[in-house]
């Protein structure tokens, strides 16, 4: 089965979408029912691309995550149900940690539609899934086996899908060990040459068992260069240098190093006895973990060296006479035997010529070897090359396929070992060509990015295959665009690109490179003067990117956005955008047909734009509104005023400057006419932010509307009951006077207010169960009353609308006017009580901001009280905040709430660390802008010394240099005085093409004033830096950091230096040398110039999604919730199949599917399958997320459980040690997740008889569990029990007894005496007491007589069986099977309720009970519950058949 990786081939780019080549899953499996999924899930080793092929494929095969409301803590969302509008909605896919801030993905779900509409939609979508089964079969298609005969190799037989292209066979051959050295060949069937871009099913006479011949083709100049590049890639295949340097989408994975080979390897290549002693840095009590183990096995990574030098010769290009003899190019080679050769490439192949370094003699050497393959030629002239090449190939094919495929986007390492810099002509050529590596292969040279991006969006999307093709095209082009934009932005900052307005001040310059428009982040034309100057200009591109993301997610046909990427590099922010056709030839004023270019003074509208934006606005909850233009005429808009519409020369309708897509956040704006509520003013709001662009997140608006909808339904239901009761009374009592009726009809305002208050106080989750019933009741009531009393029915809805603050009087309507508080914009005010009433619109925006502080922040904290999936670092914390709709600028308020909760200490610590890192980032950006390129490494190392140490920090620069710096005002190319130059024609366009320009958001030495004054970096000291950090924390987050030196920060907040170093390096893109740093050094600075290895760009962009895969995934999840694991497994396998189809083999989303499939395999009893799938999930997470990413740690813990279940006991320990090391490195030992890992380690060590070690780990786990779950929690009971088991095996029965008593007490109080667990614990106590008494008697005997006299029975210490250890491991990790009958449901319900109440987690009770009750409603007789407590505290119930 060929892995689905998409090949990038030159000619494929001729069409607009540069990706004609698609690889489909080999689906011969489709016909064999369930086998299909295994084929999906167990790719075989030689199926992945590699070498240049991998690069090509990978490049085009970028991955994006679907716009999903990501599950912040990267746990399976398998058993969580999102409640939407009072009915059960789909659970959302876990996006596994998407880019740090802009890209927390969003489900563009229309939340406020009535429950009925949504229910209908859900039905429709599931119907759609079923109706498209036919398409899926078409996708799987049939498998075909063909034989391939190539010169000098055995005939090989391969299995292919009839939907694959002939090109796939090329890729396959270039990847196989025996044929990988060929690049220039064609394939023939009979005597016909096959077309590379034909699908196999269209090839005539191709049937099962046909033989395809490989025929060597003559070389051209281009083919010869491709061949040389391929050879170079094969030789450096094992070398991790590219991954450390962050090029070609290579990245690291260490799973194989840790497991010493493939876990599934049947041939016992791994040593049987694994040393189980934990390394020193893994045992409990480690303060600062070492850095070196982060990258294990660096020494042996490279593999043998085959050649000293392979480079293009200085005799190139061939002179005229030699061209006519067929010479294409000359190469120069130095072999390991120190022999020097000049090689000619001609159309027939490669031969050695007689040139030397001084004399050109292109005639063939004597004896002459002519080889079609350069590898063959080198093998004949160098025996060392031949042996080394074979070794490299063997090691390459032994590696897992996933280790060799390129990742979708570049993953950067924050630490790197000392790398050897080798001679590499191809690398040198790539660095200085402005091409993107493959450009010269593409007809028409540079790519028209805008055309490619828009054309792919226009592809048809009616059927499933069409949608897959469209999404694949969008994904590929987007991935290439991100790569190009990143490379261009670095070139711009490094000074390698000429500006389009070179005469202007360096801050005002704009650039075009490779058809991409670049602008720097400064407020160059006082465009943002009123909004916060450079600070506003710095954040604007990020808000613009948010806007582009949501409009892309809504995907309205006919509405176009620009390709947008925001890159932070060396302290500058660069915005890269695709170019609207014709924009550079026109003045901005002529271009804009919709919106305003001067913040609302002149406003235009356009009917087509109104129509398109109204469609999008429905999903985004944007209220169409009217504003007055300069002539006092009302102009209707369906977006913010800043949003501009430009019709390009291609006739497409583009929108740009989407920075105000969502309404402003009034808590951070000082506005005259806004009075915040008492609670908010007491908390210190409004806080004046340093720019006026703060807006609310889409997730917040959705949560707010959902909350209001639930209240609306409840209030309406209350009124209905009153009405019905009144009706019945009337029926009894006969008619009443109309007066009383009218009285009843308009209840005093106090009542509705009281109801509103009630509705706010009551927990909503439980209520939502009956919401659907309520909706139906209201509908029925309306239809019944339509005849009897329409007035009353309308009155019910009207009252409910008034109570929840709906925009419309008689219908539930929540939409937001993004311009409502914009200064200088004059609104057309509507009548009181209608949706166009400005007062109402303002009230709504205020309510949403208040909801964030009073509802969402407490909800966020309550969610984390259960510690079910706790954030591990700043990135997971940020995602979790974003999923709750909380902006990071509220971090100070979140920390304040956390500081009062001892059970949340770990989160308090992580939040403080994130705040310090972000504050430091702001300062670092201005600091870097004051640094000359010459002094970058000195400046960065000096900054790190000031941040992390108290030792000497003398900057390594001579006095003269410093003096020169002081006198020189222009510090840097991009950092000169601000000029008010009148814009040239092009610069006029930037604010429309590049909506905005940007600037360092940082505060400067003055803590928050203008950032135009660059900091002279040589003057910074540890004291001054920490004072700035404190000022920044107060100014930006309103949080008082009580530390003005690193030592105080470490003791006060419990953070570690390594965590701070990692967080900061990742945030700003620094790569430090991998070595052990002595932070306490008193004599020399901790960081020197040589410790700064590299600086990387930090890239923010949008991740395209795969909608059908997402639908399959969510349907699969709901099946799993109903306990239908097999169906769930099949649906999620199908989702993986589609993801492979769209994104290729490597992608975050694929990783989520793999983890879920592994979990399901394990639950279905197939531990071996679980191990195989989870191994791939680990490699994928390491490669796509990073080797020390929180989700990688999670994958390692899962893998250790499955490898234990497969009998790899020592191996599962090694995996847990790795997970624990990474976790402690990132967030320290004091974390609930460490308790889980320690319990696992302790159990396995116990199973191996290492009782002393086992005890150390379980004691640490117990300490953490007591701290975070409280003395009455189940986690604690289990820890006590594990401790008792270990102590009894050590013969310490007294301690064991005391610990088991604790367990018994907790079980008894939580579960009651009759519960099985309580009874087990009582039995355990009895046995322990018996053994303790025996031991005591023996001891007394010895004390009294000096020897044993009485004949006492021996004491039995039985080591636990592996089966019992596995059961216990399952329990700890939350995989627990319980049999419950229908009658037990009620008992379980009350038990769970009692247990969770004790821990104060009410909302979870409702979820847990709801899922039990729902499932038990569907099943009769016996049911089996899967209580999943480790990651998700949820209960699903499955019917036992």
Curated annotation (Swiss-Prot):
Residues 726-753 have a biased composition (Basic and acidic residues). Keywords: Cytoplasm, Phosphoprotein, Repeat, TPR repeat. GO terms for biological process: asymmetric neuroblast division; intracellular distribution of mitochondria; mitochondrion organization; ribosome localization. The modification Phosphoserine is found at residue 273. Residues 64-79, 106-126, 978-1009 have a biased composition (Low complexity). Residues 1-79, 106-131, 726-769, 961-1009 are annotated as: Disordered. TPR repeats lie at residues 1109-1142, 1235-1268, 1270-1303. Its main location: cytoplasm. Pfam families: CLU, CLU_N, eIF3_p135, GSKIP_dom, TPR_10, TPR_12. Residues 8-22 have a biased composition (Polar residues). It is found in: Cytoplasm. Residues 427-669 form the Clu domain. InterPro entries: CLU-central, CLU_dom, CLU_N, CLU_prot, GSKIP_dom, GSKIP_dom_sf, TPR-like_helical_dom_sf. mRNA-binding protein involved in proper cytoplasmic distribution of mitochondria. Belongs to the CLU family. This is Protein clueless. The gene is clu.
